[in-house]
């Protein structure tokens, strides 16, 4: 089949897509998987999902096993930059189209992938931009000094959030006093306590992931540090509650949308409706605009994210379906860019509409 030529594909066409959850039981990763599943359900495709059990090597060995069953395509979550070239080579050898999501390969690796006819593209967000946005909020709130609580060094999202926050905070006249890394979330309380023992007068804590926000709030509250503000990433209902209670100032969210959008990109490719950028290359989408939860909208977001029918449906079935060329002749590279750039505003509108119905 000439995958570069648009085809007329019936709406009930079904594909099997191999994908991976780096580790089940962790909110951000499980939410990634839920967004993929929702997109698959909306588009009528089947997912074959592995649990890598937080082991990078397993993501590759399990991918090999998945490829042996000849899926129609692969949507791969690479938790480390070193995994992408390996996964790409296995997919190429198996002549299986593949898309990357959530975490991004190195630029030089992307240039290599672009020479591979089976490379569909990459759909990510900018964790560096995410961190910068939170830094701007902290500065606007009057913060001059900050400490950062993050996961282990090498974590794709956390490392880039740290860079983005630090650069923006210091460019705005603030100072990041220290960055603390926890080997796993269970160290969050102790590490934050150590931070605030060393820097008891710090203006704010930036917790770089969902699992580090509540521990920071607990420590600040237990130590009676009323002047210390907390900012976070990876919003969830419990963090919404902390914002409503005045224990957290703000938290970013929406990174999971890239997972569902990646499925649509792969399905378009499988349909023969290949999305290319202006240079004729496989697309690298990083325009996803994230939303921010503050005291102004925390209650509405809590209602939305606490509803199982809504929490992982910030993109509707109809929106997923309208990202397929088979359903919408207007879909092209620019359509995807605009869709992702407008994501946050669309979410705000859905959250507000849901609140008004309640």
Language-model regions, residue ranges each:
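Hydrophobic alpha-helical segments within soluble ligand-binding/sensing domains
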Residues: 2-3, 10-12, 59, 120-147, ...
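Extracytoplasmic "Venus flytrap"
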Residues: 1-40, 48-60, 69, 78-81, ...
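Structural recognition of the beta-strand scaffold that forms the well-ordered cores
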Residues: 18-20, 48-50, 73-77, 98-102, ...
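Anion (oxyanion) recognition and catalysis
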Residues: 41, 92-93, 170, 244
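Hydrophobic alpha-helical
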Residues: 74-96, 165, 177, 181-241, ...
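An alpha-beta-alpha
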Residues: 17-26, 36, 120, 124-178, ...
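Flexible loop/hinge segments that line or gate small-molecule binding clefts
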Residues: 88-129, 239-242
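Hinge/cleft segment of the Venus flytrap/periplasmic-binding protein
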Residues: 1-13, 265-358
């Amino acid at each position: 089949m000439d995958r570069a030529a648009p085809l007329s594909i019936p709406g009930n066409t079904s594909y099997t897509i191999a994908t991976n959850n780096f580790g089940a039981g962790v909110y951000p990763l499980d939410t990634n998987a839920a967004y993929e599943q929702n997109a698959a359900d909306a588009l009528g495709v089947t997912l074959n999902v592995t649990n890598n059990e937080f082991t990078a090597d397993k993501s590759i060995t399990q991918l090999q096993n998945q490829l042996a069953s000849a899926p129609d395509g692969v949507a791969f979550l690479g938790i480390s930059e070193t995994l992408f070239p390996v996964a790409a080579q296995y997919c190429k050898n198996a002549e299986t189209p593949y898309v990357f999501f959530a975490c991004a390969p190195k630029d030089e690796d992307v240039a290599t992938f672009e020479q591979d006819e089976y490379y569909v593209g990459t759909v990510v967000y900018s964790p560096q931009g995410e961190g910068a946005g939170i830094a701007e909020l902290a500065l606007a709130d009057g913060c001059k000094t900050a400490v950062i609580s993050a996961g282990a060094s090498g974590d794709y999202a956390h490392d880039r959030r740290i860079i983005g926050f630090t650069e923006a905070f210091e460019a705005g006249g603030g100072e990041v006093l220290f960055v603390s890394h926890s080997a796993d979330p269970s160290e969050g309380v102790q590490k934050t306590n150590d931070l605030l023992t060393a820097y008891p007068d710090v203006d704010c804590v930036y917790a770089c992931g969902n699992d580090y926000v509540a521990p920071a709030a607990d420590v600040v509250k237990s130590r009676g540090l009323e002047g210390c503000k907390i900012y976070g990433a990876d919003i969830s209902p419990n963090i919404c509650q902390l914002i409503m209670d005045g224990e957290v100032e703000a938290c970013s969210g929406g990174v999971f949308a890239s997972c569902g959008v990646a499925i649509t990109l792969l399905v378009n490719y499988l349909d023969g409706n290949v999305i290319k950028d202006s240079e004729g290359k496989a697309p690298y989408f990083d325009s996803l605009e994230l939303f921010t939860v503050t005291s102004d909208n925390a209650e509405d977001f809590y209602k939305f994210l606490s509803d199982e029918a809504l929490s992982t449906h910030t993109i509707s079935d109809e929106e997923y379906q309208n990202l397929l060329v088979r359903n919408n002749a207007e879909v092209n590279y620019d359509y995807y860019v605009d869709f992702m750039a407008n994501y946050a505003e669309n979410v705000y509108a859905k959250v507000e509409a849901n609140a008004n119905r309640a």
